[in-house]
Curated annotation (Swiss-Prot):
Rhamnosyltransferase involved in the biosynthesis of the repeat unit of the lipopolysaccharide (LPS) O-antigen region. Catalyzes the addition of a rhamnose to the galactosyl-undecaprenyl diphosphate intermediate. The gene is wbaN. Pfam families: Glycos_transf_2. Belongs to the glycosyltransferase 2 family. InterPro entries: Glyco_trans_2-like (IPR001173), Glycosyltransf_2 (IPR050834), Nucleotide-diphossugar_trans (IPR029044). This is O-antigen chain rhamnosyltransferase WbaN. PANTHER family: GLYCOSYLTRANSFERASE, O ANTIGEN BIOSYNTHESIS RHAMNOSYLTRANSFERASE RFBN. The lineage of its organism: Bacteria, Pseudomonadati, Pseudomonadota, Gammaproteobacteria, Enterobacterales. Gene3D superfamilies: Spore Coat Polysaccharide Biosynthesis Protein SpsA, Chain A. Pathway: Bacterial outer membrane biogenesis; LPS O-antigen biosynthesis.
Amino acid sequence: MPSFTLIVPTYNAGTARWNEWFHAFQKQTNQPSQLIIIDSSSTDDTRNIASTYTNNIIVISPSEFNHGGTRNKALASAEESDFVVFLTQDAIFENKNALEEILSLFNDKNVAAVCGRQLPHHDANPLAIHARNFNYGTETLIKSKNDIKNLGIKTVFMSNSFAAYRRSVFEALGGFPEHTILAEDMFMAARMIQAGYKIAYCAEASVRHSHNYTPRQEFQRYFDTGVFHACNPWIQRDFGGAGGEGFRFVKSEIQFLLKNAPFWIPRALLTTFAKFLGYKLGKHWQSLPLSTCRYFSMYKSYWNNIQYSSSKEIK
């Protein structure tokens, strides 16, 4: 049976949710050859709880954390394996064969990455419920260069909240970008598609993972998304923008709320405006003072080592 490494970045995971994570993990029918926790100096019981299940715990300072570089660092310390699975501390396995199912799509030798389905947490608000249902459907998909014309940027949709990679391809393509504000998963998926590989979405492998973000938090998250695309313009150049998908999302959200939670419509409209404004400002981050970028961003420490460049590429 092919071997795989499971990597989980953590920071103050919270006793109840972290114990729930391990309870679901222990039920998995397919267990990793190695579980690696890379922790950003948590001040709660995160490491103590994890030490019950693994000796492979790497501790870094909070300022060292980066969505790409931190995951690369964890994998660099891993034993040999065929695949690597990344999960977040708040993504709880929903079915006991989730790992088995996500790895099964690698039976196609041309598949280089797979992401699983994300269901809303049981305490998710209506906006979070709709977002998960919209973005994570019930049908498994395998995507290649041939799908770019129809799917556009959705071709390279990937989420490291629950994703698996063929390690040989991942490493051959250089791993995640070392310094990225977010979307290291989309970056790698795009590189894989460009290199002629396929990426997949496995609807049968599911976790519960969602966030009840406020409009302010959505503004921050979309500001960071705009920064990412400004710094990596080749992704939208080669795969297209998300404008049409955004309009489809808003239409679907309003229809969902009219049927299920009409009093949430004003909140949804405010959130949509916050997302739009945040994204547009993020796309033009180099026109803003660095202090303003840090204030607008959800990922504050990212801005500690930024240099401006005329090409808008992060150096």
